[in-house]
Structures are given as C-alpha cells and as structure tokens.
Swiss-Prot record:
Subcellular location as annotated: Endoplasmic reticulum membrane
Entry's Gene Ontology BP terms: protein transport
Transmembrane helix recorded as keyword: yes
Keyword Membrane assigned: yes
Domain of life from the UniProt record: Eukaryota
Predominant cellular place of this UniProt entry's protein: endoplasmic reticulum
Reported function: Appears to play a crucial role in the insertion of secretory and membrane polypeptides into the ER. It is required for assembly of membrane and secretory proteins and is essential for cell growth. It interacts with other membrane proteins required for protein translocation. Upon binding to SEC62/63 complex, secretory precursor polypeptides may engage SEC61 to begin membrane penetration event. A cycle of assembly and disassembly of SEC62/63 from SEC61 may govern the activity of the translocase.
Cytoplasmic side: 1-32, 97-118, 167-245, 384-416, 460-480
Membrane topology category: Multi-pass membrane protein
Gene that this sequence comes from: SEC61
Protein name per the record: Protein transport protein SEC61 subunit alpha
TM annotation in the entry: 33-53, 76-96, 119-139, 146-166, 246-266, 363-383, 417-435, 442-459
Length: 480
C-alpha cells in the first residue's frame, strides 16, 4: 500500500463523529470523573437487553471471545469492543509490516491514520451487527420480521458508536488510559465478582443453592449440620462457582502482580552529557498481555469457524477434522464444546481431572499455548515498534548508548536481549494462562491475565498523574 491510501479517507473527516481534544491539560480529579462516567455508561449499556429478541438460548458461537471483547450476550453490548479492537489491530499490523506507510511524527499523517481506523471500525460495526441478526442469534429473521431486524441492527450500531466515542474521550486526554482496556478489564472483573458474590439461587437437584461461591459458603455452613461436609461442598461443588476457584483466582492475580516487578535493568549513559548514567528496564512481560490476547483471538476464531462449518456440513470429513461439536458433562451449561478434531486439542481442559484423563490432549494444548504465545510475543515487537532496531534508533535519537559498549554495537546487544525476553515473557504468560485454566479460576486464564495486567497498568497511570510514586509491585514484593 502507498502512503497515498490514507488520503482516500480525508473526505470522511467532515462527517465522522469526533471528540475534540482538550485545549489545556485536564486536571487529575476531572480525569477521574470522566473515567468514572464513561465506565458507568458502559456498565449500563451492558445491562440493557436488546428490544425485539425472540430467543437467545441457543449455543453461543462467540462464547470464547466474550471476555476479551467486553461483550454481554443479548444486551446492547453484544458487539462489545470488537469493531474497535479489530480495526486497531489490522491497522497496527499494516503499519508495522510497512504495508501502509505512515509517518507518526507528521501531524497530518497521524490524523488521517486515526480517521482511517475510525472509518474501518464503523464499517465493521455495520457488518457485524447485520451478520449477528441475520445468522439467527436472536431468532430466525423470518420470525423477527423486517422491522424488528432493522431495529435490532440499529440498537447494536448505536451502542457501538457510543463505545467508540467513549474510548475516544478517554484516549484524547479527558480520562485515564484507554477506554478499550478499561471496558475489557471491567467486564472481566464484573463477571468474577458476580460468580463470587451472586445472590441468585439455582436448583441443583438437591435443593436451592446460591450461585455466588462466597455466599454459598456461608449458606452451606449455616444450614448443614456436618460443617466439614459443608466446607468440602463449598470448595469443590461442580457446575457452579466454588471457593477453590475463588482462591485460585486470587492466587493467579497475586502471581501476575508479583511477576510484573521482574525486569532486566540495562545500564545506559548519555553520549551528549558527560557523567550522566541511567538504566533502561526490559520487563519480563515485555509485550504485556498482547501474546495471550492474540493466541486467544486465534483459537476463538478457529472455534467460531469450526462451529459454523459443523452446523452446516457435519458429515464432511475435513470439517470433522477441524472439529466435532456437542455438549458434554463438565462443560458450561448449554454450551457446545469440541469433542474431537483440531479444535478439541487446542481447547482448554475444564478441570485438572479432565486434563489427567486425556494426557495427550493436555500436552498438545500446553505446547500449543506456550509456543503460540512465545511466537506472537517475538513477532509483536517487530510490528509494535519495540524491536531491537527500533529501540536502538530511539537510543541514537536521544543520545544514549549502553554503558561499556560502543554506539555501533547497541543494536547487536539489544538483539541478544529483547527477542529472548519477549519470547520468554510470552511463554511465561502462556504458562500462567494454562495454569489458570487447569486450576479452574473464576473465568478463563486469558481473562484473568488481561484484567490483572490492565488494572496494574491503570495503577501506574494513576500513580504518575496523581502524584504518588509508591510502586505497588515493589511493595508487594517486599511483603513476599
């Protein structure tokens, strides 16, 4: 693609909804207010059901993507942040691979790049809204009728436009951090909180039990005469959240928080000012949660395509090779899961017992996740502008060099460290995800990791802008 491709999007500028950037820095307290308001609007949208649905009780084809996309089925947040994330990742890929020439130091190029991203996100919103309705997620289109189908599409588009503007509001400096990260982490945290403290009751065949694991613990201790049996039931009950999952979630959260503090301090010095030294931190999670996001996106899309093909061509041998789908014990209620084929082997086990019963599948799954995360992490540094060559260029532009090394050797030294750190960090975050899935946390391993890294990122932003400098990770490490 030529750089002139961006000029094709210039006519759209006058017609796109836009949040005007603040003329002066927004005070920290006002940022907190705007962030809170944006979050409140998002949460409200996620609780309002779509008007006109005939039925949404079928197996959810987007089940594996919901947490990552901040999506709630059957609500205005059906699409979540999917159009924005998809558009952003595609354009970042095009830019990183030089298929789209963009000079980010040029204001006009930067603005056109943002316009192009927004236009593509809007097109995706229209496309996804139409597909979701016409594929029968809310009932057969013939049963819904033209008027209701159009109304459903309009509701989905309206909600997605609102999320797009909320994200832009925060990203342009009115709030803290990125709206996409905030909404995704909040959606995950909301689901975890609900599973831990839900006051609703469910009939499990032996009577009514509370859905929330913590509330169920106290309820069982109160009504059971045998307290030991009540504790065992509260910690290991099946098909409902249990206390073992609660403690597993807390353990994973603290582990990720602790590992955030692991970094290699690369000694650097200034080539312009004599005697000025410092360090360049290379974190263990050098690419943050991007590897597990990409791995999750890959597997989720394989699952989605496999399910759609199996529904239509269930007798085709090639389709069966990709995945055979159905319900089984231990799986989420009413949700179709892979029973054989490629999809089965890259699908996480539902429990430690499930993993032990099929060791070959477990080994393949673990190898796939660790390998994919390491590969994605190593590839992402080239796309995102954090590769050894990019960092070496930054050093040169800022008049920095590695202490004890010549300026001409900076790239070689960085090439020894950064790709290894990225691949190892990706494998570690993949291992944490696998561990989370095997332990059975309240939510998938991917969602727990995404929420934890995002929350810590927000803590760092708040610490920087709020004027307090206490490092949460170092403080936690001291306690450990």
């Amino acid at each position: 693609m030529s750089g002139r491709v961006l000029d094709l999007f210039k006519p759209f500028e006058a017609y796109l909804p836009e949040v005007i950037a603040p003329e002066r820095p927004v005070p920290y307290k006002q940022k907190l207010i705007w962030t809170g308001v944006s979050l409140l609007v998002f949460l409200v949208l996620g609780q309002i059901p779509l008007y006109g649905i005939v039925s949404s009780e079928t197996s959810d084809p987007l089940y594996w993507l919901r947490a990552m996309l901040a999506s709630n089925r059957g609500t205005l947040m059906e699409l979540g942040v999917s159009p924005i994330i998809t558009s952003s990742m595609i354009f970042q890929f095009l830019q990183g691979t030089q298929l789209l020439q963009v000079n980010m130091e040029n204001k006009q190029d930067r603005e056109l790049y943002q316009i192009a991203q927004k236009v593509f996100a809007i097109l995706l919103t229209f496309g996804q809204a139409i597909v979701v309705v016409l594929t029968g997620n809310y009932g057969k289109p013939s049963d819904l009728g033209l008027a209701i189908s159009l109304l459903l599409i309009f509701q989905l588009i309206f909600a997605s436009f609102t999320v797009l503007l909320l994200d832009e509001l925060l990203s342009k400096g009115y709030g803290l951090g990125s709206g996409i990260s905030l909404f995704t982490a909040t959606n995950i945290a909301e689901q975890i909180t609900w599973k831990a403290f839900a006051p609703t009751t469910v009939n499990v065949g032996r009577g009514q039990e509370f859905e929330g694991a913590v509330i169920a613990l106290f309820h069982l201790l109160a009504i059971r005469k045998d307290k030991k049996r009540a504790l065992v039931e509260a910690f290991y009950r099946e098909n409902l959240p249990n206390m073992f999952q609660v403690f597993s979630t807390i353990g994973v959260f603290l582990s990720v928080l602790y590992l955030q503090g692991f970094r290699y301090e690369l000694p650097i010095k200034s080539t312009r000012t004599r005697g000025q030294y410092g360090s360049y931190p290379i974190k263990l999670f050098y690419t943050s949660n991007t590897p597990i996001m990409l791995q999750s996106a890959l597997t989720s899309n394989i699952f989605l395509i496999s399910q759609i093909l199996y529904q239509r061509f269930s007798t085709n041998p090639l389709v069966k090779l990709l995945g055979v789908w159905g319900t089984r014990a231990g799986a989420p209620a009413g949700q179709q899961v892979a029973l054989s084929g490629l999809s089965y082997y890259i699908q996480p086990p539902f429990s430690v017992t499930d993993a032990l019963l099929d060791p070959i599948k477990t080994v393949v799954y673990v190898g796939f996740v660790l390998g994919a995360c390491a590969l994605f992490s190593k590839t992402w540094i080239e796309i995102s502008g954090t590769s050894p060559r990019d960092v070496a260029k930054q050093f040169k532009d800022q008049g920095l060099t590695i202490n004890g090394k010549r300026e001409t050797n900076v790239y070689k030294e960085l090439k020894k460290i950064i790709p290894t750190a990225a691949a190892f960090g990706g494998a570690v975050i993949g291992a944490l995800s696998v561990g989370s899935d095997l332990l059975g946390t309240l939510g998938s391993g991917t969602s727990i990791l995404m929420a934890t890294t995002t929350i810590y990122g927000y803590y760092e932003v708040a610490a920087k802008e709020g004027g307090f400098t206490k490092n949460l990770v170092s403080g936690f490490s001291e306690m450990m």
